[in-house]
């Protein structure tokens, strides 16, 4: 089961008696270590259902699940391999009743949150300001602050105003039986922190927790991990301080600093052999990150040979840069016999808006290409419309889903009619959908608006 692992990887896999931090440099086989450790735990007799492997994206979780399946076969389906937020959904659906949430609660997307925050602010705020408030509220939640705590810590009038809006926003979420993305971490943390019976349940359920991309965890995720593993501290955190790039959304390297303090028996294993790049590339990368402050110093090395030297090219403009890149690709293909396939080349850029010049240059050269990323299938308007209908079917208190459903397709129901319905629902402390069935509604709405709503 451990064939093909180097000595450092074997050390990380075989240490199962306490807390373990695996410092995994880029391309050092961290996913391999995680999946082999899952297999090793099962080999030693642990129930697959007692193992949780947590990562940050659904794509990474799917890849990990597939690689675990290759190692342990059908047992992989019993291992909890998921994102932090997927774990949060499961915890709140199972135990959220103590927080006043039904198991059928709705999970709001970014657009829903934006609309509710605008409504909480009085409905007259411009979109850009509402987005800024949304970002601030999200950051506060990632720091573990509720509205009252945010108000107490506010530095100025602007932050105090946002904290007040946050309180109204939270009231609306509660009324709608809905949660946002950040709640999927903060609510499980509240469950574990405030309800001993829930904490005992999850600590007894999970015998070992593995966390991928640990350097990207924020304060609430760290606290959640601590409460999940309890005093036994049976966990494996896999990360790299040199790859921490999400500080702007709450990720903190303090979580790496805290581990040796909170878990004095922490075993630290460094994975320094890179299996992806040549020595020339690694030397350049080591020189770039060399001046960075180091929590745990390490130096990556490769046994793939020296390789081609790294070239740095000065360009006059974005268009010139794109043309040079395309010319380089064409030159490399022309020099090889047989020429490599187009899919053997990649162009990396920092942000999506930088793709356009490269796309134009590739089109001019008649080179086939594929842009990774872009709009998610679930972000398409028609898919959001369909999902809103399903959400409303499952949870009739989901006001954001109602507002999207009632407007698609168009039924002649305007903003004023919906505002009147909203006022009626607020006055009678009910959801928008439930308000449609109130015998008092006809007296509150114009006949035409009422007919359109009842037709819905």
Show the residue positions of the predicted features.
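Conserved nucleotide-binding/hydrolysis micro-motifs of P-loop NTPases
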Residues: 28, 58-61, 85-88, 139, ...
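P-loop NTPase Walker
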Residues: 1-103, 107, 176, 199-200, ...
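Helicase P-loop NTPase motor core
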Residues: 22, 26-34, 96, 102, ...
């Amino acid at each position: 089961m451990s064939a093909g692992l180097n000595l450092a990887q074997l050390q990380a896999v075989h240490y199962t008696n306490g807390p373990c931090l695996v410092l995994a440099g880029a391309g050092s086989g961290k996913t391999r270590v995680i999946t082999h450790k899952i297999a090793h735990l099962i080999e030693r007799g642990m129930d697959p259902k007692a193992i949780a492997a947590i990562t940050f994206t659904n794509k990474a979780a799917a890849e990990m699940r597939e690689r675990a399946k290759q190692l342990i076969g059908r047992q992989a389906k019993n291992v909890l391999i998921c994102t932090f937020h997927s774990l949060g959904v499961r915890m709140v659906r199972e135990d959220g009743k103590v927080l006043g949430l039904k198991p059928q609660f709705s999970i709001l997307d970014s657009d829903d949150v934006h609309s509710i925050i605008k409504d909480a602010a009085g409905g007259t705020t411009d979109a850009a300001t509402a987005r800024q408030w949304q970002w601030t509220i999200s950051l506060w939640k990632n720091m573990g602050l509720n509205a009252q705590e945010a108000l107490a810590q506010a530095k100025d009038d602007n932050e105090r105003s946002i904290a007040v809006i946050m309180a109204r926003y939270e009231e609306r979420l509660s009324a709608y039986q809905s949660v946002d993305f950040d709640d999927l971490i903060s609510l499980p943390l509240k469950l574990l922190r405030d309800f001993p019976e829930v904490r005992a349940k999850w600590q007894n359920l999970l015998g070992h927790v593995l966390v991928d991309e640990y350097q990207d965890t924020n304060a609430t995720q760290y606290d959640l991990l601590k409460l999940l593993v309890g005093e036994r501290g049976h966990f494996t955190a896999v990360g790299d301080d040199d790859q921490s790039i999400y500080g702007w959304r709450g990720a903190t390297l303090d979580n790496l600093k805290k581990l040796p303090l909170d878990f004095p028996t922490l075993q630290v294993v460094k994975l320094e052999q890179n299996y992806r790049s040549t020595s020339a590339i690694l030397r350049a990368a080591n020189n770039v990150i060399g001046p960075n402050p180091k929590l745990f110093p390490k130096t990556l090395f490769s046994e793939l040979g020296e390789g081609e030297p790294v070239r740095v090219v000065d360009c006059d403009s974005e268009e010139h840069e794109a043309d040079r890149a395309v010319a380089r690709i064409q030159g490399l293909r022309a020099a090889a016999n047989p020429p490599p396939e187009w899919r053997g080349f990649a162009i990396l850029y920092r942000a999506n808006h930088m793709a356009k010049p490269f796309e134009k240059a590739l089109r001019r050269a008649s080179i086939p290409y594929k842009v990774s990323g872009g709009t998610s299938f679930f972000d398409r308007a028609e898919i959001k419309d369909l999902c809103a209908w399903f959400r409303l079917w499952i949870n009739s208190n989901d006001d954001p889903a109602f507002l999207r459903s009632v407007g698609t397709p168009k039924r002649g129901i305007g903003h004023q009619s919906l505002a009147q319905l909203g006022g009626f629902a607020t006055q009678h402390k009910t959801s928008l959908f439930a308000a449609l069935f109130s015998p008092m509604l006809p007296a509150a709405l114009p006949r035409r608006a009422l007919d359109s709503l009842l037709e819905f």
